[in-house]
Amino acid sequence: MNIKLITLLFLLLTPLIEASDRNTEIDALLDGLHQDAHEANFETYFARYSSDAIFLGTDKTERWTIEEFKDYAKPAFEDGHGWTYVVVERNWEGKGQIKWFDEILFNEKLGHCRGTGVVELKNGEWKIANYALTMLVPNAIAVEVGVQTKEADKP
């Protein structure tokens, strides 16, 4: 094969290989996050977040800095329970050092949920900068859930 052709193929394929490697790294980051939560591995779970990360939980009051989220999660992790969300599907977008994702998860108590977030490449390592967990409500019962939510919000 001609050296120019080999060089051209290398130059054309390298970005695809790098993108695939990045995608694999991001999937491993998120899969590891869910595994660490399931196994109640406090240190490795929180090491996956950036130091300035924000976590949004299912309750309207749950907007936490990573330190606030650690305080919330610590008792569950110390009891060895953590929490279990099984990934059903995941999608992500973005290029370069910032990507965003959405994933459908399943939890025994809450049913299907959605996790969305942003990951950022910092010092050669992907970190979660933002994660939001929401409950998925089927349209057929959305009004009923809305009524219950408004009732629960009353002082």
Residue ranges and their predicted role:
Residues 39-52, 56:
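Short, well-ordered alpha-helical segments enriched in acidic and aromatic residues
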Residues 2-9:
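Sec-dependent signal peptide recognition
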Residues 20-37:
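Short N-terminal segments immediately surrounding and downstream of signal-peptide cleavage
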Residues 122, 130-155:
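Low-complexity, intrinsically disordered terminal/linker segments enriched in charged
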